[in-house]
Amino acid sequence: MTLPPLSHLDRLEAESIHILREVAAEFRVPVMLYSVGKDSSVLLHLLLKAFAPSRPPIPLLHIDTRWKFREMIAFRDRRAAETGVDLRVHINPDGVMQDVGPISHGAAVHTDIMKTQGLKQALEHGGFDAAIGGARRDEEKSRAKERVFSFRTARHRWDPKNQRPELWNLYNARTGPGESVRVFPLSNWTELDIWLYIYREKIPVVPLYFAAPRPVVERDGAWIMVDDARLPLHPGETPQLRSVRFRTLGCYPLTGAIDSNADTLEAVIAEMLVNTSSERQGRMIDHAPGASMEQKKLEGYF
């Protein structure tokens, strides 16, 4: 009997599920990073599919910086309750003691302490030897050259010159003393693939991805949403309601929205088909001096 060929999305799905099962089989204490964004939503859906009808053997880990959009935190807790997954949340206690934030300490310091150092703390505290993430190669140039199984040193640093060859769908999971692995099952997906899969599978995502009237101010050429009273307004600055949406989500003072009327999945996909700019154009931290994605990964960032 001749089976019909798999569609493009079916092939991507099968590859990702294979990688997730490989992680569960090869590592002692794996964990999945859950940032609450669209890629994390797809990863969670794939994780549930990979081990259905059982509960996934891999817990979720969220690094909370205390500056995420309120809708993100509400969505995170709701999805954890709906799916029954084991969700663990970590906030860097040192950052809390110093009251570190993007306004008071700047984007680079905030990202390093609350994200990078917080992630390293959580991985060490949990004894995790593999951390699954939703990074894709089409997002950014340093991620384009990263392996699916990305080996990290005992200090969680990424050495791009010291990685294993990956032939076809064969992955070497053998680690040296102190090493750990970051695993990226969505490596070969594109932003458009993600949205098409969300549409096909009816995957819930944070409403911030859809256009709606939101209070924003213009900062450095980007629309920054006034999500709560912690965002100080500049002299003469007044929030204005604009129809905006977000292509990527992070800490709200560091995440720029785009003008858009795409308030449905179909409209978002149609917008994607004609958009030529990077989805990370709204990540203000990417434009800070010395804050390139590769530099952050060398320091232990995901």
From Swiss-Prot:
* Annotated InterPro entries: PAPS_reduct_dom (IPR002500), Rossmann-like_a/b/a_fold (IPR014729), SO4_adenylTrfase_ssu (IPR011784), Sulfate_adenylyltrnsfr_sub2 (IPR050128)
Pathway stated in the Swiss-Prot or TrEMBL entry: Sulfur metabolism; hydrogen sulfide biosynthesis; sulfite from sulfate: step 1/3
- Keyword line: ATP-binding, Nucleotide-binding, Nucleotidyltransferase, Transferase
Among its keywords, does the record have Nucleotidyltransferase?
yes
Q: Name one Pfam family in it.
A: PAPS_reduct
The keyword Nucleotidyltransferase appears for this protein: yes
SUPFAM superfamilies, A to Z: Adenine nucleotide alpha hydrolases-like
- The highest taxon in the source lineage is Bacteria
Q: Tell me which Gene3D superfamilies the record gives.
A: HUPs (3.40.50.620)
| Example of a GO biological process term | sulfate assimilation
User: Under the GO molecular function aspect, what terms does this record hold?
Assistant: ATP binding; sulfate adenylyltransferase (ATP) activity
Write down the chemical reaction(s) this protein catalyses: sulfate + ATP + H(+) = adenosine 5'-phosphosulfate + diphosphate
- Cite the EC number: 2.7.7.4
Function description: With CysN forms the ATP sulfurylase (ATPS) that catalyzes the adenylation of sulfate producing adenosine 5'-phosphosulfate (APS) and diphosphate, the first enzymatic step in sulfur assimilation pathway. APS synthesis involves the formation of a high-energy phosphoric-sulfuric acid anhydride bond driven by GTP hydrolysis by CysN coupled to ATP hydrolysis by CysD.
The similarity annotation says: Belongs to the PAPS reductase family. CysD subfamily.
Q: Which PANTHER family match?
A: SULFATE ADENYLYLTRANSFERASE SUBUNIT 2
Q: How does it assemble?
A: Heterodimer composed of CysD, the smaller subunit, and CysN.
Please identify the protein, giving its name as recorded.
Answer: Sulfate adenylyltransferase subunit 2
Which source organism does the UniProt entry give? Answer: Xanthomonas axonopodis pv. citri (strain 306)
